Design a protein with these regions (language model features):
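N-terminal leader/targeting and accessory segments in enzymes
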Residues: 1-96, 294-297, 305-309
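Adenine nucleotide phosphate-binding catalytic loops in nucleotide-utilizing enzymes
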Residues: 5-12, 17-19, 190-194, 229-309
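Phosphate-binding loop of NTP-binding sites
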Residues: 13, 28-31, 55-59, 68-214, ...
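Residues that form or immediately flank small-molecule/cofactor binding pockets and catalytic motifs
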Residues: 44, 92, 141, 171, ...
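Short linear Ser/Thr-Pro motifs
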Residues: 22, 67, 162-163, 235
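Short, surface-exposed amphipathic charged segments that create phosphate/polyanion-binding patches used
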Residues: 62, 101-109, 243-253
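Cofactor-binding loop segments of dinucleotide-utilizing enzymes, especially the Rossmann-like FAD-
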Residues: 19, 42, 112-113, 139, ...
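Residues that act as N-cap/strand-start positions at coil-to-secondary-structure junctions
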Residues: 1, 153, 238-239
């Protein structure tokens, strides 16, 4: 019999790194469910927030939760490590809460350099127009902890994940994860292109189905280490069996149905704008939804009704 994470949390003194949207959400939850909570933010602006971490404060902290975007080499993070205080990402914290209060809820995740927000909004449109009890959260929609604690619980959460968040997270597991593309943009934070790729790969390693851009050499290089059985590629070319792609003016699924069969996911003309990168986004969104059993009819309806903000 494992002791409950939430039961243990009641006696924990929690430090939140970051007083932004995520930090505020976490604080609201922890003020009820933890022993005590303190927020550290260098741009201290709320009451009850501190801007500097001192040894005195560290001596009264049991666990730390880090908001997105905090670097691993930040001095505060270093202090926490030296004090042997466990550090959780907000994703892993929310996952542990979910595991107790909504054990049936399933997560899908999405990462990539460009197009994440549009793609996750397409997924949200498929949920909405297919009457799926799910929501998009993280960088779009509500925070992950708010989505997890929503009553009644959602069946599905679709998370837009940055490399920052993936690098910090070890516990969360996904029904499906998608890698849209990899451009060399966040190298400063990760230190090298290699570690940036590794952060992206982390999502696919902990996903049952790994959806990846078959037209992106960087992305395909990153997934070489994965079990090929679980990889589903999306492509702007004609899809082979086990992939999703384009056949003339149709988006077609040859991955989530019987061998040799194909189903239409969307008409090209229903994607607005039907420019290549946006068609790729639609294929990724469709594949994520097909991976959790959403019908191609519902996918089609969601894409048709989606317009860019």
């Amino acid at each position: 019999f494992m002791s409950s994470f939430l039961t243990e949390l009641k006696s924990k003194r929690v430090l939140i790194l970051g007083g932004g949207v995520t930090g505020k959400s976490l604080r609201k939850y922890l003020e009820i469910h933890a022993h005590s909570v303190v927020v550290v933010d260098e741009q201290k602006n709320q009451s009850g927030e501190i801007s500097v971490l001192t040894d005195d404060i560290l001596s009264r902290i049991d666990i730390a939760i880090v908001s997105p975007g905090w670097r691993r080499d930040h001095p505060f993070v270093d202090m926490l490590r030296k004090s042997n205080i466990p550090i959780l990402s907000e994703i892993d914290f929310a996952w542990q809460v979910k595991s107790e209060i909504a054990p049936e809820q399933r997560w899908i995740g999405l990462t990539g350099t460009n197009g994440k927000t549009t793609t996750i909004q397409m997924v949200a449109s498929i949920f909405e127009h297919g009457e799926i009890n799910g929501t998009a959260c993280g960088n779009v929609g509500e925070t992950v902890i708010d989505a997890v604690t929503h009553q009644p619980p959602f069946d599905f959460l679709a998370l837009e994940l940055s490399s920052f968040q993936l690098e910090w997270s070890d516990k969360a597991r996904y029904e499906a994860g998608a890698l849209l593309n990899i451009a060399e943009d966040h190298i400063d934070w990760h230190g090298s292109f290699d570690s940036y790729g590794k952060a992206k790969l982390k999502l696919l390693e902990v996903s049952k189905v790994a959806i990846v851009n078959g037209d992106d050499d960087n992305a395909m290089a990153v997934v070489r280490s994965l079990n090929p059985e679980k990889i589903i590629a999306f492509t702007l070319n004609t899809p082979s069996s086990g992939s999703v792609g384009l056949v003339e003016n149709l988006l077609v699924d040859r991955a989530f149905i019987g061998d040799g069969d194909a189903e239409v996911l969307s008409e090209l003309s229903d994607i607005k704008p039907a420019v290549p990168h946006n068609v790729a986004n639609a294929l990724a969104a469709a594949a994520l939804c097909r991976a959790i059993g959403i019908s191609s009819e519902k996918v089609q309806r969601g894409i048709k009704n989606f317009t860019l903000d």
